[in-house]
């Protein structure tokens, strides 16, 4: 709320200093963003046209504008949370876009986000939901990530409210579907024990990146070219 009040004061000061009067109002299409609520109210009060823009299209359109391009282009938008056209949480998107419109060409396969926004500060929930989903796949590759893998025993031992999480995921209670790359990074960070209780949105992913930079050199060899379509998208399987 403090940030919102600061924005309102800055907006009023800007209009007064520069005698600026907007003719069109644009905002994120998210129904609950404070800035979007402000934009809708302002447009209504002043009789101005309102343009609501999808979050990830806005990212790509801004890059087009900065580079004086009109498109179409293939744009990749990877972030934490953005309200999708279908009402789901987007965040791992490949869009074919112009400045005016876009087509959602591909996205990270959706996974459960137990607790919705609460999972941002509790990424262990998301990690558990992913492992639970992998466990239900009859697939040799994804079987490596099943809940019965002994490597995940320490994670499961420290996980709280597992029975409640099972109910939420199985029944879809306050558990929206999500295609967010940021939430996926959060889950991996929690699963590895790097950051299970972040203090702010994105901290778990940032600490995961920091750990990766200080990790050992090397890689995981992939020799086959078998693509999996489904929960984990197009993943090249090791022969």
What would you call each of these model-derived segments?
Residues 1-239:
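Short acidic/glycine-rich loops and adjacent helix/strand connectors
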